[in-house]
């Protein structure tokens, strides 16, 4: 963040808040390269392109300075000389560098807001697990929840327009349009599953998508809080946004209705809660199903009117929390009653009272997880471990380290599961798959290989938390048993991994 502050202050004095000159600076691509190396994935570290080097960056910048290479051929865009043989590599480098540039205003705004609110350890708020304590606190008191699949954007210009309220640099926005229209097939961005959350896509597309989601969530939050303003900081930008929406076929008033106070009363619900991650969100309420249906059809109409996104009401499912479970962030969560018996005595009479309380139950999704392991060839579809043949050429230490890392990441992520038995089964599959892979490499049987190595191989699969607690407490102690049964939420999990994301 300090690097962003220094770089931007330098160019503010020279370029009048223009961001686009930064794309010609080498340190921008160095920042993008460092971010790529620091990505955390489950199976393998897929960082920035290994072919990237300082020489390639210098060559890329020199070609961008030559305007002839930046001209667009409308009739034959495949013959663009700018990319030439290294089209994919240069395209990746430009998009990641441009993403770093566009993120600068957002990063500076975040830093200033944290200083104003004096927020301590703000990185803890970024953890995925921080959502589940919110679930435990709020959801037992609610009755209905809607599973909302956010539709993918299909109109490029609307996405660019949503950025211009934060990036006040027309040249950067024009460069963004040029880059997206010329060097990317926009249809790949709106293809579900394989596009916007895939590893092959760039950080720039995620930034655009998050801006699109933030745009509609700002109005959703406005209706929820019944405030007198949107999230914008100036009324001039608010009027500019309204005029932009009025240029579209459907004006704003068709969504908000003519009587604005009546519209606010229409959505009045002090107990409604909203949670989102990636393309899925949950809207929960304590009110009746009638209000949930109002929100349902409002969202469908809003997406169609403002973003030209065709969304069907069937994409939003309304369920009763006490009877249905919901799948969110890899956990299968539900609300179940927790009945405790209390003995009360009044003078000489004693009686028993049932104290019923609702509790959030977070379960480990064993069947989808076995399906995910089967896709990457750790087991078959029935859950029987098999050898990972593609890893048989690696060294023994490398094979063991890969399996241990996968098992540790799964244990770390699913530490909040209410019942750990299913998690132990997955760890058993990984252990036996590791042994079979090593036995295959050494052309031996599993039984013979285990006799040769002994129990030390299986000890590698204990997580760091399990090792510490096993040293502090005996195996039979009640403290260790409560540790294995209890839920633990960690504040260092910043992304959801491939095996966890079963969709």
From Swiss-Prot:
It is found in: Plastid, Chloroplast. GO terms for cellular component: chloroplast. The keyword tRNA processing applies. It comes from the Eukaryota. InterPro entries: Domain_X, Maturase_MatK, Maturase_MatK_N. GO terms for molecular function: RNA binding. Its main location: plastid. Keywords: Chloroplast, mRNA processing, Plastid, RNA-binding, tRNA processing. It holds the Pfam family MatK_N. One of its GO terms (biological process) is tRNA processing. Belongs to the intron maturase 2 family. MatK subfamily. PANTHER family: MATURASE K. Usually encoded in the trnK tRNA gene intron. Probably assists in splicing its own and other chloroplast group II introns. This is Maturase K. It comes from Rosa acicularis.
